[in-house]
A protein has these predicted regions:
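Terminal alpha-helical segments
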Residues: 75-80, 95-97, 101-106, 112-289
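Short gly/ser-rich loop at a beta-strand->alpha-helix junction or flexible surface loop bordering the NTP-binding
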Residues: 31-45, 49-52
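Generic secondary-structure microfeatures
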Residues: 37-39, 69, 191, 196
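Flexible, active-site-proximal loop/turn residues at the rims of small-molecule/cofactor binding pockets
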Residues: 39, 72, 259
Length: 289
């Protein structure tokens, strides 16, 4: 794993060194501290302010930090400890103008089991992450080739999680429709589709892209299930318009005050999302058999 943060500006390097100090001050059982996410990939956004749809918005990437411990803590205990580390880090800083720290934690045993079983979130951290602190007492596992039973179990686990998540969004969309909240309904329909497509991708590949674009996700899902493209054909102008509306809903339904979605739009979209649900269930369950 990489260890250098010299590509970052001095202030960022100082921040990360201080984060390490704050964690070690309150957590003697800490074995590793790993930077992951956009700062590890050097794709971070330091500060971006713009006017979108008449609303001033700003965005800053977080410091994503994985804290690895020698023992497995109860959730409320480790949350309390890392909350102390966070508070200590912000002392003397303007908390609302500083880069936010987001901690996750794993015991070394659980982390190594996840890497060994090729769980993509953790293998990505190992591949892209930067070791900020290492006690030297443990080593990270190597990912290995899974046997058929393990592949089947992991595919089924991913499918059950994402498919149920998609169903939750679809249920929320139905509540929104009944309440005549069509704009937020379109967002929940987008999220349902995103998770249905990811159900297919994960079931077939055990990997999920960091992606919200339905254009991209539908294309990837189609390589594993040609039938998935039947839910949103784009042969006519109206079919294209409905798909574009759903694609745009991820951002515009939340931030654009003037984004317009009608009852008729929702009534046309829901059967398409339900068809995608049924296709997803069929192709994924056949794959897992």
């Amino acid at each position: 794993m990489k260890t250098s943060i010299n590509y970052l500006p001095e202030q960022k390097r100082d921040d990360l060194r201080r984060i390490v100090e704050c964690v070690l001050e309150v957590l003697p059982d800490c074995e590793m501290i790993i930077l992951y996410g956009s700062y590890a990939r050097n794709t971070y956004v330091d500060y971006d302010q713009r006017i979108e749809y008449g609303i001033r918005t700003c965005f800053m990437s977080d410091y994503d930090i994985l804290v690895v411990t020698s023992t497995r803590f109860q959730r409320y205990i480790i949350n309390h400890i890392l909350s102390k580390a966070t508070d200590n880090y912000y002392k003397g800083k303007n908390r609302y103008a500083s880069t936010t720290v987001q901690f996750i934690d794993e015991s070394i045993d659980d982390l190594n089991k996840a890497i060994d079983k090729n769980r993509y979130f953790y293998t990505d951290i190992k591949r892209e992450g930067i070791m900020l602190y290492n006690s030297g007492r443990y080593k990270l596992a190597r990912r290995r080739k899974l046997n058929y039973r393990e592949i089947k179990e992991l595919a089924e686990e991913y499918y059950n999680d994402r498919f149920e998540r998609a169903n939750d969004f679809l249920r929320n969309a139905m509540y929104d429709k009944n309440d005549e909240r069509y704009k937020i309904c379109s967002f929940h329909l987008h999220q349902a589709c995103e998770n249905y497509y990811n159900s297919i991708i994960l079931t077939f590949t055990l990997y999920s892209p960091k992606e919200h674009s339905l254009i991209t996700l539908s294309g990837r899902a189609k390589t594993h299930s040609l039938e998935s493209s039947e839910a949103f054909p784009r042969d006519t102008e109206e079919e294209k318009r409905l798909f574009d509306l759903l694609q745009d809903a991820y951002v515009q339904a939340r931030y654009n005050l003037h984004f317009r979605v009608t009852k008729e739009d929702i009534e046309a979209l829901i059967p398409k999302v339900e068809l995608l649900r049924d296709i997803t269930r069929q192709c994924c369950e056949e794959r897992i058999k």
